Amino acid sequence: MKNRLLIMILLLLPMVAMSQVDTGARKRVMEEYRQQYRQQFNEYKDSISGQFIQYLKQRWDEKQLFQGEHQPVRPEPVLQPESDTLSDTLHSEQLPTGDMVTLQVEQFQPTTTDKVATYVAEVFNIAFYGKQLTFKVPVNVSKIKLSGSREYQISNYWQQLNKEKLNQVTLQLAGQKQELRLNGWGLFDLTRQLTASIYPNNADQQVALAVYLLNAMHYDVRMGCVGGNLVILMASASKIYDIPFTVVSNVRYYAFRPIGAKEELKGRLYTYSQQLDGANHGIDLFMSETPQLGGRLCSNPYKNRFGGRDITIYVNQGLMDFYAQYPQMELKMYANAAIDEVFYLALERNIKPLIEGKNTYRAVSTLLQYVQEGFGYQVDNLQFGREKNFFCEENFYYPANDCEDRALLFSYLVRMFVGVDVVLLEYADHVAAAVCFPKEAKVKGDYYLYRNNQYVVCDPTCKGAKVGQVSNKYKKQSPKIIQTA
């Protein structure tokens, strides 16, 4: 019952913070939360010092370590396709559809800021993607030594941690999560960076401390051991590509080494099956809001000229660095991600004037042409040596993009500045988009029927392709339809 009450309070905190409630009511909610959190952390410490510490000492189970699911590689053309092979005559034809892909996200807010209690602390300064952060950690924590990666050694280390005021550290971490608007992955990354700062020369100790802290914030992470090295096993509802994983109790756990570790994970994996009480929330990777990571803009802005206008757009360098290390996910996760507020204003200032005064069809046509002509084209394997989906802002940072990035960018521009619905069309070797025009627009062209509405095909990659034009090879395919927010 206590656990449920705490989680309900935690889930309500973001709404409380954003709503226009009176100060007195907000203080009462916060104080109730703080009392519950302190009590819950004490219960967490009790559970560790009791049965769970003893459980960690037992021999860990051997689990199969899968070598990561590779991100699908689309056999895209090396050169940007052009519309020479498309017919100039547009006919309205309903095309066959495949699966419908929607995004369902469970978000979890672990804690909020609290007044840090007085205690003897060691100060650690972290440069977190353009933000300078300071953490106060109980002075004894950095002195506690993990003597090895055996079960009893880890158990003894956790028992020593349990004597320290680490609830003050989790409060600081959770406070930064709120302040910087981090999602679960952002907090996971920040926790790893903090533990790397505390134990710069002991990778195993970084893992053991990170798992302790994340468990205390109710996240479902575990320790594993591969080839004598500890790893963090992170539960996530989102599919992550190219990261080794194991399965425990039908839950997929992705294996992460400490930051900076170079060793490839090889060998048998050993871990424990029992879940620590209350640590049952997977790490969410969905970007429901954009992290606030410093104000430094990149030194090399996107510049172009289109429609008689000079277009210059800067993006946040810290955000680009954050996205550069972000795990690769399914396309639907990018298609529905939030965008940076400053970046949105730059788009509004530079792109929106291109379509002012135009009807829906002409506005969509202009944006389609802009995306077709306004960016260099290069497939991911040539630009990065691997597959890489872009968040929207990354299109204005890297020198080139490919089909899925263009389709995603086009969908954002149409939704933001034209105000009509867009879906993505994921073919076996290509990604395009489709726009739901108002019925009175009477737009001709190939379309898909989705939720009883016609979505007219738009291909932002094929240079010169008009609204409603699609290559004959794709008319015979049934793409996945990815819903956008």
Segment roles from a protein language model:
Residues 2-10:
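Sec-dependent signal peptide recognition
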Residues 10-18:
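Hydrophobic h-region of N-terminal signal peptides that target proteins for export
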Residues 19-28:
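Cleaved targeting-peptide boundary
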Residues 27, 31-213:
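Long, contiguous, compositionally biased segments that the model treats as domain-scale units
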Residues 139-143, 147-191, 333-398, 461:
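Secondary-structure boundary elements
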Residues 205-352:
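Extended, non-transmembrane interaction/recognition domains
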Residues 221-250, 355-358, 405-485:
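Hydrophobic/aromatic-rich core segments of domains that either
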